[in-house]
Amino acid sequence: MVSLDIVRKFNGSLSSRLPRPVALFVGGTSGIGRSTLRQLALNTNAPTAYVVGRSESNARPLLKELGQLNPLGSFKFIEADVSLIRNVDKICEGIKTREKSLDLLFMTPGGLSLVGRRETSEGLDKLFALRYYSRIRFAQKLMPLLEAAEPAPGRVVSVLGGGFEGNINPDDLDLKKGYHILSCAMHSVTMTSLAMEHLAASRRASFVHVYPGLVGTNIYTNSFPSPLAAVYNYGMWPLMYPFSVNIDESGERHLFHATSERYPSNTIGNDRRLAARGELDPAIGSNGTFGSGAYLMNWKGDTSEAGKKMQKLRKEGMTERVWEHTTNLLDRTVR
């Protein structure tokens, strides 16, 4: 476990470690994304942060607060439905015209759903698109900017379920036939980890897949009808609260996950002399090697190899198969 004291010490040094960072927060207007964005504003010097969300009017109080926390910062809102891949491409093209590099891509879009498959106008399930396809598309399209970041390569953080990988159906990866709540969750989590491993092997960027733990956010209020949300908020949450992570601490820890030298890219992690410049040794990557560039992480900053199931998937060639499926499907979607 990375102690909270270490997290705070590191975050407090970011003004000198990471001068004038450029970041994109997808889903940054509430919950963990919002909390992490606030910590970025508090701990960095003159950041530029693009914030993608569904409602500009709802985001105005946040943008005002960020400006007060960091008057030298630039905080720009982009209103978009990122369940549509075409919108993702449009956002990425806009950022590439404005920026030469990107230090951080931080993604939390999604939510919960008790209903079945709901297809977007592009033929993807909406929740699956938010949890997996759109996130990978952002990483894919913004890779040139992430690789151009200095002094350290850029980092991609996807907050979902790192370390909870499991079985997926290789003949129904997009769940056109066998969609249900659990299959969507398992495919989203496992395919994210496999796709990140694929990217980390050859890219000058690092990839972090985080399970955030139990955090007090408005996810149930935003995802479910009022009666059901009330059952959770007033009936279940009080029982779960003692085991939860405070939303402010979650933001502090996720900023550490997003910027610490503990999770370097493959190009740095393999060079222990470069990695040693940081105060913390490189973490074990998802494939079992130090500094591999892809990391499966819990809320405390501990990393795992995801055990026998990921090993089995690698042996079966699922890393390459998932990546090929993903790129082909995304390209077909926007034709």
Segments from the language model and where they lie:
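A glycine-rich helix->loop->beta "capping" turn
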Residues: 71-76, 93-107, 111-119
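Active-site loop of short-chain dehydrogenase/reductase
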Residues: 102, 146-168, 204-206
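Amphipathic alpha-helical dimer-interface segment in Rossmann-like NAD(P)H-dependent oxidoreductases
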Residues: 130-150, 197-201
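Glycine-rich NAD(P)-binding loop of the Rossmann-fold in SDR/ketoreductase-type enzymes
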Residues: 83, 126-134, 187, 245
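NAD(P)H-dependent oxidoreductase Rossmann-fold/reductase module
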Residues: 2-78, 94, 171-335
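Rossmann-fold scaffold of SDR-type NAD(P)-dependent oxidoreductases
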Residues: 26, 100-110, 157-160, 208
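Short alpha-helical oligomerization interface
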Residues: 113-131, 177-178
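The beta1-alpha1 cofactor-binding region of Rossmann-like NAD(H)/NADP(H)-dependent oxidoreductases
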Residues: 57, 79-90
